[in-house]
Amino acid sequence: MSKKALCIISGGMDSTLCAYLAKKEGYEIIALHFDYEQRTQEKERECFKQICKALKVEKSYILDVSFIKDIGGNALTDKSIDIPKNELCISDTPPITYVPFRNGIFLSIAGSLAEKENCESIFIGVVEEDGSGYPDCTDEFIQKAQEFINEGTSKNFKVYIKTPLVRLNKAKIVELALKENVPLELTWSCYESEDEACGECDSCLLRLRGFEKVGFKDKIKYKS
């Protein structure tokens, strides 16, 4: 029986690279995507499907967690809150694009699904880069989430949460993705737009900076 990994894939660059690294390690990939009524939900779902096809994933899940929008309090699900432009948020305080406890919610659900599918690992593309203030993207949080999941699941089940990118910056991530032949043109990072990336939000700026530092042109379309 082959070993299985549940890969949480948003459609973005980091989670996609994680899935490719899982495949390289010999895992049979089960892909998991969450719809939470984020601004770019349709684009992210489309990217997820294309990435699954590129990875030749045989089993995938798209789960509706739209209750996250009902909780609100962030610019990704509440269009009345402006997404900051042309400034990289480097702070100990979570930015307005932080979705409260999103990764905690995702990992709780992933733990349940991993037990059902008998996966030995969960891959998630969290990155601590630049002290962005996302409290659920730290290595410490992930370790505690792993303990929580293993404490609350069957005694004969144990899962490891793998975060191969947690200590890398975007330049290193782009460099590694290119080395592993990850189709970055299938990924999406923009917080705001679905047709052409805005090139101005925090996520776009980090992505563009990563490509610039490795001297490689990003193949996705930008508005400017």
Swiss-Prot record:
> Its encoding gene is what?
queC
Chain residues that bind ATP: 9-19
Q: Which cofactor does it need?
A: Zn(2+)
The cofactor binding remark recorded in the entry reads: Binds 1 zinc ion per subunit.
EC no. given is: 6.3.4.20
Family matches, as InterPro entries: QueC, Rossmann-like_a/b/a_fold
Superkingdom assignment:
Bacteria
Per UniProt, which keywords does this protein have?
ATP-binding, Ligase, Metal-binding, Nucleotide-binding, Queuosine biosynthesis, Zinc
Origin organism of this chain?
Answer: Campylobacter jejuni subsp. jejuni serotype O:6 (strain 81116 / NCTC 11828)
Catalysis performed (reactions):
7-carboxy-7-deazaguanine + NH4(+) + ATP = 7-cyano-7-deazaguanine + ADP + phosphate + H2O + H(+)
Q: Which CDD domains match?
A: QueC-like (cd01995)
- Pfam annotation, one family: QueC
Write out the similarity annotation.
Answer: Belongs to the QueC family.
Q: Does the keyword Glycoprotein apply?
A: no
Which residues constitute the signal peptide according to the record? none
Q: What's the top EC group for this one?
A: ligase
Protein name, as recorded: 7-cyano-7-deazaguanine synthase
Mind telling me which PANTHER family this protein's record contains?
Answer: 7-CYANO-7-DEAZAGUANINE SYNTHASE
Pathway, according to UniProt?
Purine metabolism; 7-cyano-7-deazaguanine biosynthesis
What does this gene product do? Catalyzes the ATP-dependent conversion of 7-carboxy-7-deazaguanine (CDG) to 7-cyano-7-deazaguanine (preQ(0)).
Which residues of this UniProt protein bind Zn(2+)? 190, 198, 201, 204
- A GO BP entry: queuosine biosynthetic process
What would you give as a GO molecular function for this chain, any one? ATP binding
